[in-house]
């Protein structure tokens, strides 16, 4: 996977966390940068670990399904991307409207884990491709740190406008990467 695909994957994977951070920022009363950075660090750390876990699981099975690798990566990315697009169009109840001043650590960890499960599945798919998983996981984690921090700071301003669209955009990026993987297999 080339560097542009890695960057697209990293920011595509960060969109769930970005959307969640917008929601978290929207519920806080004047979030401070330190709170946004704390959220970004938690989300980024977990989002770095989950593709590594998925990749490890995928490597255990790689000897059995190596000839299907492009189809597995394509299917996982299209499935996850499609799920993100569908979730982006769903109407979900808003979080509690009462302003808060800080989110609890375990609430953030739980949210980060929930938004990073797709990164674990992508890690499984990446096990069947020739990628530097450490660099890819770090790129995903850094993109998530950046996007989550930004999402928290601007959440209360753009939450009603962009919140779900961020998830839709992330899903479209994942579907595009899946298509690129399949195309590169058949083209070359």
Swiss-Prot record:
Its main location: membrane. It is found in: Cell inner membrane. GO terms for cellular component: plasma membrane. Pfam families: Mntp. Keywords: Cell inner membrane, Cell membrane, Ion transport, Manganese, Membrane, Transmembrane, Transmembrane helix, Transport. NCBIfam families: PRK11469.1 (NF008546). Belongs to the MntP (TC 9.B.29) family. This is Putative manganese efflux pump MntP.
């Amino acid at each position: 996977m080339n560097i542009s695909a890695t960057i697209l994957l990293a920011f595509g994977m960060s969109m769930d966390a970005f959307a969640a951070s917008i929601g978290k920022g929207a519920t806080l009363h004047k979030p401070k940068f330190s709170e946004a950075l704390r959220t970004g660090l938690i989300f980024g750390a977990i989002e770095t670990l989950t593709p590594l876990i998925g990749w490890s699981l995928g490597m255990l099975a790689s000897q059995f399904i190596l000839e299907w690798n492009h189809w597995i990566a394509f299917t996982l990315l299209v499935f996850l991307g499609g799920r993100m697009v569908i979730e982006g169009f769903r109407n979900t109840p808003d979080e509690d409207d009462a302003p808060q001043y800080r989110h609890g650590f375990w609430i953030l960890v739980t949210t980060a884990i929930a938004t990073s499960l797709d990164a674990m599945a992508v890690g499984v798919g990446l096990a069947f491709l020739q990628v530097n998983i450490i660099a890819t996981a770090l790129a995903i984690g850094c993109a998530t740190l950046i996007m989550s921090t930004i999402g928290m700071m601007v959440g209360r301003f753009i939450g009603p406008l962009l919140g779900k669209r961020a998830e839709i955009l992330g899903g479209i990026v994942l579907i595009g990467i899946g298509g690129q993987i399949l195309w590169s297999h058949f083209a070359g």
